[in-house]
């Protein structure tokens, strides 16, 4: 008889608009025929309810359990008061001097206990459906690990190590006592919480090692994420001098990485080759776009695109990520689609690519510019495309992922 597997998620991973969405979706999809699948997920304002039907077409076996946080005021008076409160809060924020410590408060917020209503919801789901295994994903809802019945085996998928990202951010503010305190607090909380799980899955062996070094004693398995790969690779190589950056600004490493590239590399590249263009794919807030366009008016923001390949084919993808952990799905996507790429060391961390063989890897802005210019060589582009694509096909297949996850669940 099949066991009952509950996925507890911060969002429904569909459509596949980000690397996180893809990693979660493929993790569910690969075991959908091996378990009775239940998916509890948060629903927030802006959620398109039609997405639920689209998801069901892809994984009809799943029982979907939305945690709808949208609230409607009971009457007109309450709605007016609610709107006034939000307007006053926004105006008060404008009048308040910027506090550089606000971002450190967000570190504390990220692993807070989930609202009582949804803790009880998850508990009731576990009892109603006799859940055998519950799998929590993404750091900002990791505290659900603490809300599960003792009869349920607890698995946590660590997409990104919070303490790694915070530690890198702290390097830019080394004398801030409050920041140091927040870092130590969140680190202790993160490690303690992870030790309450029965098993932890990381998406790279590097993250597994870092967790063990910080004192995690729960068994850890390095799994991986996958992307869809075409059976036959048809490289699309042109003389176009186009760079692409893929990723939304709600992921802080994307914001920091793009700004780092624009500040340290972009103008130097344009001085050497004025014809280069830079296109940014993914949803970005208008204020963030305008902030970048002020000093870099030639950057093109394309927003979310329905067909990523058609948008980035013929380009060189840049992955200038400087903070964070986990695995960069954008690199796996590029390799699977036949898109050559250049990356920082952090950007490619945990992915078995080698500098000069599959891509170019460097943290030196000057060398990064030189590497981009080297990729004007069509033969070198083709070499990188073929080598990286072969790596993805060999190490990131759906069946390999399925066997990996089943081995983990069998150990519980």
Residue ranges and their predicted role:
Residues 330-333, 340-344:
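Short hydrophobic beta-strand element within catalytic cores of glycosyltransferases
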Residues 81-133, 139-142, 174-196:
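Conserved nucleotide-sugar donor-binding subdomain of glycosyltransferases
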Residues 379-410:
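A charged, aromatic-enriched C-terminal amphipathic alpha-helix characteristic of glycosyltransferases
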Residues 198, 312-326, 337-339:
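Acidic donor-binding loop of glycosyltransferase active sites
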Residues 155, 180-183, 191-232:
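Donor nucleotide-sugar binding/catalytic pocket of nucleotide-sugar-dependent glycosyltransferases
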Residues 222-297, 301-308, 312:
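Conserved catalytic-core segment of nucleotide-activated headgroup transferases in glycan assembly
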Residues 5-6, 148-170:
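Active-site proximal beta-strand in glycosyltransferases
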Residues 356-366, 373-379:
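Conserved acidic donor-binding segment of nucleotide-sugar-dependent glycosyltransferases
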């Amino acid at each position: 008889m099949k066991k009952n597997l509950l996925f507890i998620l911060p969002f429904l991973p569909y459509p596949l608009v980000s690397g996180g969405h893809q990693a979660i979706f493929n993790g569910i999809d690969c075991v959908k025929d091996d378990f009775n699948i239940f998916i509890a997920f948060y629903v927030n304002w802006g959620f398109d309810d039609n997405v639920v039907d689209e998801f069901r077409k892809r994984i009809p076996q799943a029982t979907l359990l939305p945690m709808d946080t949208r609230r409607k005021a009971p009457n007109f008076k309450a709605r007016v008061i609610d709107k006034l409160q939000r307007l006053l809060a926004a105006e008060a924020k404008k009048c308040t001097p910027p506090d550089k410590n606000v971002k450190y408060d967000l570190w504390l917020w990220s692993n807070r206990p989930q609202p009582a209503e949804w803790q009880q919801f998850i508990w009731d789901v576990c009892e109603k459906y006799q859940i055998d295994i519950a799998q929590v994903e993404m750091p900002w809802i990791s505290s659900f690990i603490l809300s599960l019945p003792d009869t349920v085996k607890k698995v946590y998928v660590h997409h990104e190590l919070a303490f790694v990202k915070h530690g890198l951010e702290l390097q830019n503010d080394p004398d801030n006592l409050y920041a140091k305190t927040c870092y130590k607090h969140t680190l202790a909380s993160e490690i303690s919480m992870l030790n309450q799980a029965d098993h932890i899955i990381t998406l790279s062996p590097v993250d597994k090692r870092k967790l063990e070094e910080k004192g995690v004693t729960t068994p850890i398995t390095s799994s991986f994420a996958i992307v869809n790969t075409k059976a036959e690779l048809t490289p699309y190589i042109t003389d176009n001098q186009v760079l692409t950056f893929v990723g939304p600004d709600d992921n802080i490493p994307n914001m920091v990485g793009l700004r780092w590239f624009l500040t340290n590399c972009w103008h130097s590249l344009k001085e050497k080759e004025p014809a280069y263009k830079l296109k940014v794919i993914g949803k970005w807030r208008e204020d963030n776009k305008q902030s970048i366009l002020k000093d870099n008016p030639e950057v093109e923001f394309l927003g979310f695109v329905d067909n990523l390949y058609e948008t980035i084919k013929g380009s060189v993808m840049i992955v200038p990520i400087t903070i964070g952990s986990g695995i960069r799905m954008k690199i796996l996507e590029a390799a699977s689609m036949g898109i050559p790429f250049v990356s920082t060391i952090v950007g490619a961390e945990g992915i078995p690519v080698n500098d000069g063989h599959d891509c170019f890897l460097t943290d030196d802005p000057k060398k990064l510019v030189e590497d981009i210019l080297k990729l004007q060589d069509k033969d070198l582009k083709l070499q990188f495309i073929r080598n990286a694509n072969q790596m993805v096909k060999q190490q990131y297949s759906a069946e390999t992922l399925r066997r990996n996850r089943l081995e983990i669940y069998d150990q519980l």
